[in-house]
């Protein structure tokens, strides 16, 4: 169908074309166009840059149309399959669904970690480009970068109030950043002999734990920056450290294929968990809300009665996810389905689901009660390295070797 412009629209378009030709140095073309379009020599100021603005607006609209079409296709598919609509699902049942709300670019190397701020509508990404970026996850806007590390930033963590951000790096350092006002680095801590791979705050916020390729875990006092404890026991690179919400215990995982649970106030290892057949890449503590789903799934497996927990999930290069009762050192269930290394884990705040990120480029949503993968999102163009689930808002974020951070809406 031929589109017909009004006389006024034609005049405005001609003025915009003349401005574009003049601004970009096409003098001969401009002279010819002016004669043929019967234009005056001066272009009105209001037409300055108009052609470019119209062009970019069209591109934005096309992208929006494509996103809406993808959402419509997804909705139609769910209706056909008999899935419940958003109105019938409670927030505890909302899960991330394609397409992504935002795909954020700016990092110049692989994303190593993505986390939500505990209070504000912000998220943080760490990268092998040695920077940390802050984003608004509700608008997709880039806020600022934190620079100071001289090698890959491996992990980031907030204290409970979100006033401090801790980061660790392959440059062997741990840094503390003021996240309230200045966004400056306020402390740098040295002591590890190799790549520092993970960092986590103790819930009270007065100590930070770090895990390293030097096979140790260290505890640092926030106020002074001094190392006050060193935990030893792993036989290989310690990949991740995560503290239980109560703060009395923390867990670590390693290339030695084990997970260890430690007492925070002593240097003692409470339990060593063995069942994985390859490096354990990631761990995540289950919220209290997950206890009933885990117990039901475990009861169907082994009939050993009610488990008290606390419960811990682990993801490995053996492509499996395991759920453990750390009080007795028992693996309660194994989730299989990924086609490559499992790199990130996050529990749904409602406790029914677990989401995982993998080198198979997917995010998978696991129904814990039924021990099955209920949704697969083909999330990135390269390995998925990290994932986080917001505790209060219906959002999931993921990071990848493809250098993008993606925001997924749950519904």
From Swiss-Prot:
WD repeats span 106-147, 148-187, 191-230, 233-272, 275-334, 337-376, 379-411
Give the GO biological process terms: border follicle cell migration; centrosome localization; centrosome separation; chorion-containing eggshell pattern formation; clathrin-dependent endocytosis involved in vitellogenesis; dendrite morphogenesis; establishment of mitotic spindle orientation; germarium-derived cystoblast division
- Where found in the cell? Cytoplasm, Cytoskeleton; Cytoplasm, Cytoskeleton, Microtubule organizing center, Centrosome
Which keywords does the record carry? Cell cycle, Cell division, Coiled coil, Cytoplasm, Cytoskeleton, Microtubule, Mitosis, Repeat, Transport, WD repeat
The record's annotation in SUPFAM superfamilies points to: Lissencephaly-1 protein (Lis-1, PAF-AH alpha) N-terminal domain, WD40 repeat-like
What cellular-component terms does GO give this entry? Answer: axon cytoplasm; cell cortex; dendrite; dynactin complex; dynein complex; growth cone; kinetochore; kinetochore microtubule
- LisH domain residues are 9-41
Q: Name one GO molecular function term.
A: dynein complex binding
- Coiled-coil ranges (or none): 56-83
> What are the TM regions of this chain, as residue ranges?
none
The family database entries (PROSITE patterns) matched by this protein are listed as: LISH, WD_REPEATS_1, WD_REPEATS_2, WD_REPEATS_REGION
InterPro entries, per database record: Dynein_regulator_LIS1, G-protein_beta_WD-40_rep, LIS1_N, LisH, PAC1-like_LisH-like_dom, WD40/YVTN_repeat-like_dom_sf, WD40_repeat_CS, WD40_repeat_dom_sf
Family in the record: Belongs to the WD repeat LIS1/nudF family.
Could you tell me what this protein does?
Positively regulates the activity of the minus-end directed microtubule motor protein dynein. May enhance dynein-mediated microtubule sliding by targeting dynein to the microtubule plus end. Required for several dynein- and microtubule-dependent processes.
The Swiss-Prot or TrEMBL note on domains reads:
Dimerization mediated by the LisH domain may be required to activate dynein.
Q: Protein name, please?
A: Lissencephaly-1 homolog
Provenance organism? Drosophila erecta (Fruit fly)
């Amino acid at each position: 169908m031929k589109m017909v412009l009004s006389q006024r629209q034609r005049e405005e378009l001609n003025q915009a074309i003349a401005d574009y030709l003049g601004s970009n140095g096409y003098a001969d073309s401009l002279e010819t166009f002016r004669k043929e379009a019967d234009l005056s020599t001066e272009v009105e100021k209001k037409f300055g840059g108009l052609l470019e603005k119209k062009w970019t607006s069209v591109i934005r609209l096309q992208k929006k149309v494509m996103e809406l079409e993808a959402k419509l296709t997804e909705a139609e598919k769910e209706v056909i399959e008999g899935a419940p609509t958003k109105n019938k699902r409670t927030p505890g049942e909302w899960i991330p669904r394609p397409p992504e709300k935002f795909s954020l670019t700016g990092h110049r190397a692989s994303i190593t970690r993505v986390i939500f701020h505990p209070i504000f509508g912000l998220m943080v990404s760490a990268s092998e480009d040695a920077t940390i970026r802050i984003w608004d996850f509700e608008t997709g806007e880039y806020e600022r970068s934190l620079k100071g590390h001289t090698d890959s930033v491996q992990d980031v963590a907030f204290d409970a109030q979100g006033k401090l951000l801790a980061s660790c790096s392959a440059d062997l350092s741990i840094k503390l950043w003021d996240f309230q006002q200045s966004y400056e680095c306020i402390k740098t801590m040295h002591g590890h002999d190799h790549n520092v791979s993970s960092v986590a705050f103790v819930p009270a916020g007065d100590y930070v734990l770090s895990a390293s390729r030097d096979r140790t875990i260290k505890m640092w006092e926030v106020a002074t920056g001094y190392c006050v404890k060193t935990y030893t026991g792993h036989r290989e690179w310690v990949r991740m450290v995560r503290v239980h919400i109560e703060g009395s215990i923390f867990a670590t995982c390693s290339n030695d294929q084990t997970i260890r649970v430690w007492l925070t106030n002593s240097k003692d290892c409470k339990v060593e968990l063995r069942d994985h057949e390859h490096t354990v890449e990631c761990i995540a503590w289950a919220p209290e809300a997950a206890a009933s789903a885990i117990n039901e799934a475990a009861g169907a497996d082994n009939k050993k009665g009610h488990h008290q927990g606390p419960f811990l999930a682990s993801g490995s290069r053996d492509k499996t996810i395991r759920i453990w009762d750390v009080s007795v050192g028992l693996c309660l269930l194994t989730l299989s389905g990924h086609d490559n290394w499992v790199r990130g884990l996050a529990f749904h705040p409602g406790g029914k689901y677990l989401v995982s990120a993998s080198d198979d480029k997917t995010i998978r949503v696991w129904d814990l009660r039924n021990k099955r993968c209920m949704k697969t999102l083909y999330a990135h163009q390269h390995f998925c390295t990290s994932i986080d689930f917001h505790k209060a808002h219906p959002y999931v974020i993921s990071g990848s070797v493809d250098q993008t951070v993606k925001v997924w809406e749950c519904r």
